[in-house]
Amino acid sequence: MKLGSTEEKSGGGCSLPTEVSPPALQQAFSKILHGLSRQESSGQGNAGNAALRDLGALIEATECDKLFEGTGGGGSPREMPEILGQVAKALEKFAAPKEKADGSEEHPEVPEKATEVGLLFLKLLGKVETAKSSPVCPAWKTGLRHLSGPTYIFAITHRLKQPWTSPKSQHVAGEVLSLLFRVTECSSVAEFLCGENKDDRGRFAVVLGLLKPHLNKETWKKNPAVKHVFSWTLQQVTQPWLSQHLEKILPPSLLISDDYQTDNKVLGVQCLHHIVINVPAADLLQYNRAQVLYHALFNHLYMPEHRLIQAVLLCLLDLFPVLEKALHWQGEAARASTHCHEVLQLVLTHMESEHRLLLRRTYARNLPAFVKKLGILTARHLKRLEQVILGYLEVYDEPEDESRLKILETLKLVMQYTWPRIPCRVVVLLKALLKLICDIARDTIPTTEAAKSAVLQEATDCLILLDHCSQGQVKGLLANIALSCDDSTVVSCIRKVQGSAEAPGEDPGDD
């Protein structure tokens, strides 16, 4: 867009020739906004591209005092900064990916638009940087306050590898974010969002306000980037800044986690987990929020998706202490571990019948944490734990045998916590452990040498602990086997058990 003779720049400083009146400048920006909105509504790219070209020319032709100071007459001094904020919002929306009618994740048209828009953001931020060093442009702070939120959302949308980005658009978005941090004098995303001190409140609330219209049930899928921007931004904010925004961040996180697509479920659960570990228990217990979280997470355990199960179990393990506090406060200390018992019972039910290796691995990976959490109360589940342990020891998990290593870790913990209940199970457990050692020794299992060594060591430790729980019964039962066995690996393990004097590992009560 040309401003005719009024585009001539003055020789020094940040002033625009007086021939260009502030109302004319506002009108020019309004016309560009109209062009961008028309492209959004009609889907015609020409209007949007022309508007981008006009905007670039207008930014270059306008000096910083006119760009940030507002009207020169009787108008409000906030008008131009507010208009710049509207322009920034329009640019961010123009470059954002849109939901495809056919459900496709490809957005071939977006990277080029994002690159052009990114260059315009660089020009706008460049004007701010120039104004900061000019004594005649004091209103740059107001302008930056309106620009920073949309600029940040644009940069986070396009800076990482996504279906709607290209290396070029990622590079430009990265430059935009770097320049934004420079002009705001922030050294990190966390400082930008949270502020440096009590006087600087940060921009997290501003970003949430801009995202809010796009994070309700009707709109959150129209822009496939918004969930990623929300999730990534949320996880940059930690204690103690997060709790004051709880009412704004909890509903979108629950909404995303409740979707039918697994990727969205996992993303939502990760958001919920971040909230659980960064918001005080008192805030989570207020208005029964913790119970809402628990029921939402518990229902996900019925989904046979290993990534989702992993995210949910990790979140629940951090949520249990919050739920226990509520029961303690209600004078029900005896029922404090009720939720953990419920989850472990369901997990064991799924483990008994699960045949998919990824899910078996996920369940086994998290089982030790539940045993540690319950401690001696694990005895309530001992019969079912025994069946799960015996079943999982029979199936290898190539290439690292992670499932059996975690099951052996679980067995050690169970024996340490529930040792009075172990003597009656000595024979069953001894047979399972010896069979495992023999299978490893015969080299019939396609796992790595490191995994085989680790399994042998863990199995031997379990035998030593089993012997201590049974007051030496295992050594007596192994005596004849050591004499008749000709496999050096098996004999070596037996000799370690026979020569042991103390149970391996530390007392779990010291954790």
From Swiss-Prot:
Where do the coiled-coil regions begin and end?
none
Region (Disordered) residue spans: 1-21
In Pfam terms, one family for this protein is Tti2
Any Gene Ontology CC annotation? TTT Hsp90 cochaperone complex
Compositionally biased region (Basic and acidic residues): 1-10
UniProt family annotation:
Belongs to the TTI2 family.
The UniProt subunit note reads as follows: Component of the TTT complex composed of TELO2, TTI1 and TTI2. Interacts with TELO2 and TTI1. Interacts with WAC; WAC positively regulates MTOR activity by promoting the assembly of the TTT complex and the RUVBL complex composed of RUVBL1 and RUVBL2 into the TTT-RUVBL complex which leads to the dimerization of the mTORC1 complex and its subsequent activation.
Chain's role:
Regulator of the DNA damage response (DDR). Part of the TTT complex that is required to stabilize protein levels of the phosphatidylinositol 3-kinase-related protein kinase (PIKK) family proteins. The TTT complex is involved in the cellular resistance to DNA damage stresses, like ionizing radiation (IR), ultraviolet (UV) and mitomycin C (MMC). Together with the TTT complex and HSP90 may participate in the proper folding of newly synthesized PIKKs.
Query: What's the name of the protein?
Result: TELO2-interacting protein 2
Protein species of origin: Rattus norvegicus
Q: Taxonomically, what lineage is the organism?
A: Eukaryota, Metazoa, Chordata, Craniata, Vertebrata
